[in-house]
């Protein structure tokens, strides 16, 4: 590349002659800087204004405020002399100019025809079953602590409106799960933010962060949490939650069974039901249950009604046949490994070794010299490997004990649900074990928690993207 051309591009970008250090350090960014230089900011400003009108109409900011905010950011480099900060500004501006139109700008244009779904689940027959099942699981003490996920930003409703359209336009690479997906099946389910899985989380959240910044003037930050794989959360300046997203590979996306509702793909509720049963092994989720059992009752009833209708599951109130769920599980507390007997089902393995420490699982997989482990990322929170009729996997939640040696039924069911998640994702045998696990919710004893085996502790530092401070650490 001709040095004079590079100097001219840098001079146009910085609105000053670049120093020798700036020239040598920034010339590798020539193409990105050139894209920013030729970017049509007037069209971009128009897109942001349309986004505001459609999704943030209640926010009090004028068109001139928005224009000023955008032009100020695109001239920020002119008064920045730190090479590190310049790199950050260039990276973020480059993401905006190359992706915003396709990611968020498109949401203001006319979309494809909406094929309204007639799917609606009347859960009245499942309400009693769900309420009884949750009552038997309601064995934790209420606490006053507030989990981070409960501190919700005032911008959530605006972002939810945007997300509904985003899910329709980008339904090949973004799907939803959780309370909003159940709301689409049953309007009685209330939801807060919208839980999503997508293949381009980082780009989407950066574009959304800028949209919020330009419209509201607020500084929002993106955090990457070390103990959750490929997870990012967008927070406002009060550290309140706006939206989060798990990033997954395209092959993982293709493995997930989905249901199309109103042009939005949701994770198959059978898979969501298994995730919910698995979740109850986590002690703080049982504390949530103790605080608000009715909220979870309508969600569980919706999931149960879905599997009843779509999987032909029969609920048997007076069970005469032996139910093999939860599958028999034995824990080695010192090794933190649980052995689950899976021999009663037509699985491609006869037992399962469930590791409570992910590093131990990884080490043992290496020792087995096996290279066919499957990792479904955040969908399962574990890799899986079948070797010599044994399924090896990792369980990321706490284990509840009902005695010094016996695993509590809540955790045994959670372990069984984790194994069924593997079966669902690999399209294996599911109907018989699914029938058994949902029927295992009927007529169970309510046992107190004797002890709690802690979950695997993850180390690492939080990553951050702070637009205002020109910081990127992930």
UniProtKB/Swiss-Prot annotation:
Transferase is among the record's keywords: yes
Domain of life of the native organism: Viruses
Effect of residue 270 to T: In strain: isolate Neethling vaccine LW 1959
Pfam families, alphabetized: Pox_polyA_pol (PF03296), Pox_polyA_pol_C (PF12629), Pox_polyA_pol_N (PF12630)
Gene Ontology process terms (BP): mRNA processing
InterPro entries documented for this protein: PolyA_pol_cat_Poxvir, PolyA_pol_cat_sf, PolyA_pol_nucTrfase_Poxvir, PolyA_pol_nucTrfase_sf_Poxvir, Poxvirus_polyA_pol_cat_C, Poxvirus_polyA_pol_cat_N, Poxvirus_polyA_pol_cat_N_sf
SUPFAM superfamilies (alphabetical): Poly(A) polymerase catalytic subunit-like
Enzyme Commission number(s): 2.7.7.19
Subunit structure: Heterodimer of a large (catalytic) subunit and a small (regulatory) subunit.
Cited function: Polymerase that creates the 3'-poly(A) tail of mRNA's.
Protein name (Swiss-Prot/TrEMBL): Poly(A) polymerase catalytic subunit
Source lineage: Viruses, Varidnaviria, Bamfordvirae, Nucleocytoviricota, Pokkesviricetes
